[in-house]
Swiss-Prot record:
UniProt: ATP binding residues: 220-222, 229, 482, 534-537
Organism: Xanthomonas campestris pv. campestris (strain ATCC 33913 / DSM 3586 / NCPPB 528 / LMG 568 / P 25)
Subcellular location: Cytoplasm
Function description: Catalyzes the attachment of L-aspartate to tRNA(Asp) in a two-step reaction: L-aspartate is first activated by ATP to form Asp-AMP and then transferred to the acceptor end of tRNA(Asp).
Name of the protein in its database record: Aspartate--tRNA ligase
Amino acid sequence: MRTHFCGLVDETLIGQTVTLAGWTDVARNLGGVCFIDLRDHEGIVQVTVEPAEGDANSAEVFKVAASLGYEDVLQVEGVVRARHAVNDKIRTGKVEVIATRITILNKAAPLPFHAHENPGEDTRLKYRYLDLRRPEMQRMQRTRIKLVQALRRHLDARDFQDIETPILTKATPEGARDFLVPARMHPGEFYALPQSPQLFKQILMVAGFDRYYQIARCFRDEALRADRQLEFTQLDMEFAFVRERDVQDFVEDMIRAIFKEVVDVELAAQFPRMTWAEAMRRYGSDKPDLRIALELVDVAELVKTSEFPVFAAAANDADGRVAALRIPGGATLSRKQIDDYAAHAAKYGAKGLAYSKLSETGEVSSPIAKFFGEEAFAALLAHVGAANGDIVFFGAGSYNKVSDFMGALRLKAGKDFGLVAAGWAPLWVTDFPMFEWDEEAQRYVALHHPFTAPAVDDIADLRANARTAVSRGYDMVLNGNEIGGGSIRIHRPDMQSAVFELLGIGAEEARAKFGFLLDALNYGAPPHGGIAFGIDRIAALMAGTESIRDVIPFPKTTGAQDLMTDAPSPIAAEQLAEVHVQVRPKQA
């Protein structure tokens, strides 16, 4: 139906006859001449219709051109010629196609929005097929496609084996809720959609496949936000006979090569490394954005004897923290703006936010200064590095809570004050805690997942020091986004059973849920480790968008709906009966 793509018609084709196909981007009837911007996936070319006196064919072509509306689908035949008025804004701006025939392949109904408009997100998702025609959306989807293609080429060339793992599998606790699928042939029993291929890829290592990868679809029934979806795509990888640095060095080289190939970005020749403890202490986050130079400063030692009870209590608590954040030039903040910062911190658990301003002349303005002697407060500000014109925020409370809300303030201040440097800041975060204590459940939970190996090999040591145990987990972070997470796995059945026990998973429960894994580890499992990268998140970073929905062809809303297909939707009683499911009426 076509000999060339619209966006690739150029000066080398001048004088030649071409056949094009695409959508009517714009049609302009100027009376004696019609101009059509014809668009396909490669871009736009101008089609010109000039009726010649006494020429029945050109008159018919003009009549067709004059009838066109937005997004009509056309086939155009014509001769390429140089444009009198060059359009430098498009790739084909030096040429035009003089139409000798126009065939309307399909008429478009009146549009809810035009390809060059940017309506509300619900409208975009309802008419996703129209939204995806927009050049910006085409660009972002192509970025994702190029990313996946480049990853496959890179791994295939290095002897990784692309192996599929089951989509219908066993429900296992991996953090979020499972999506459950009723098993028609086994009444009352259910499959689960995989949250990740974690256990299968470990078993593939036991099976001797050495290097595995998969572009895997994963499913988690969790609350949605800009960087989360119910179903998502990850690059899943696993290596046999490796230590942490073996995995990290390989994938660091891979990510560096992929960014260069896909978006022509040169990442650092060596990614910095930082322990989890250092990241939390300096940045209040386990995924710090190193483009922002601001850092948290611990001040507990300086406030232990202060008369401000909030500070003194946290400073004298072994699990407490008092931290300060200096914002250069922040003394310009109004009281309302400071209240906005306090409200932002409250979203992350802050019960209050203290501050101190230093005017350009060095005058201190702070509601907490009265709890300190003049010299003591001056020493506190000096320890933080405060200078004239700055504001210093203080947070006090439990260590993790203070780290969370002060880290959130750091990000907000960095953006508000234009302190986010241009470029890319990758790093590795390592040495995560093995466990964290769940106050509500009154038990330990795994910080990564229960198959992550501890840094110690001795089970008695792990049991005795579970509270402070460090894992062999690692995350790759880019511009404040966790783009990949992995670990060295537990390959000994006795260690895996011990970790289950520390997590409150008894032997009987472990056998019921993970018996197949424990059995596999008993038959000569090699030391192994791996990592998984979020394809959606990396594609969004490459495409320059804050929402992964922009790089997913058919995403769900934050309300977990597909507005285009109207999913989820009720199921007929007959279908429910076939899978032995009965739906309880909603409670009034």
